[in-house]
Regions:
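Extramembrane terminal tails and long inter-domain/linker segments of multi-pass membrane proteins
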Residues: 83-92, 121-195
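Hydrophobic membrane-spanning alpha-helices of multi-pass integral membrane proteins
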Residues: 28-33, 59-72
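Divalent metal-coordination and catalytic microenvironments
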Residues: 24, 65, 75, 115
Length: 195
């Protein structure tokens, strides 16, 4: 990072909690957040079932809050000289360690709640159509979960950013391409396979 790459600040921050916080801020903030976001985005396509939106939102809030509460105090401790890999520390760092510990528990609960909600929805979640998010890109035109060959008929290619090209089909309970909304031009409908 910028602080650890500059000699004037790295001399002070080297081998402190700042290094620990920076590493975990990048890895948890970038990797874990992307993993959870990708799982929630693709879950309906993978399983053909929708996750519990409330559990997803609560899990997201807890992960975000716990993540910042865990690692932000470590930046402060490191900038104040708290070395890493020490079992004991000065009393001035006690409150920061306590907040960081509370944040770790909140983060863990958020991750656990998110995964429990996803696993539960894979078996008990409400069935969803092939396009529950009104997405205009090609992958959302195949069934959820996708068939072995993905498409039975030639898919309609639209601009992936033209969200007005999608209309809601109440019979299928999903969004479909506007071109398929007209029965004269639509291919035969195929109901999603039961699980």
């Amino acid at each position: 990072g910028l602080f650890l790459g500059a000699l004037s600040t790295d001399i002070h921050l080297h081998d402190t909690y700042f290094v620990v916080a920076h590493f975990h801020f990048v890895m948890v903030g970038g990797t874990l957040t992307a993993l959870l976001g990708g799982l929630f985005h693709w879950w309906p396509k993978i399983w053909g079932r929708m996750y519990n939106d409330f559990l997803g939102r609560v899990g997201c809030f807890l992960v975000f809050t716990g993540f910042n509460l865990t690692f932000f105090p470590q930046f402060v401790m490191g900038s104040r000289g708290m070395p890493r890999r020490y079992a004991t520390y000065d009393p001035e760092f006690l409150a920061f360690h306590q907040w960081s510990t509370i944040g770790a528990f909140v983060l863990g609960i958020g991750i656990l709640l998110s995964f429990v909600g996803l696993v539960y929805s894979a078996f008990r979640g409400p069935r969803c159509g092939s396009n529950p998010f009104k997405a205009a890109s090609l992958e959302w035109q195949s069934s959820s979960p996708p068939d072995f060959h993905n498409f039975i008929h030639k898919p309609v290619l639209n601009d992936p950013y033209d969200f007005d090209s999608q209309v809601y089909d109440a019979e299928l309970d999903t969004y479909i391409s506007r071109e398929f909304a007209d029965p004269a031009t639509a291919p035969p409908r195929k109901e999603p396979a039961p699980h």
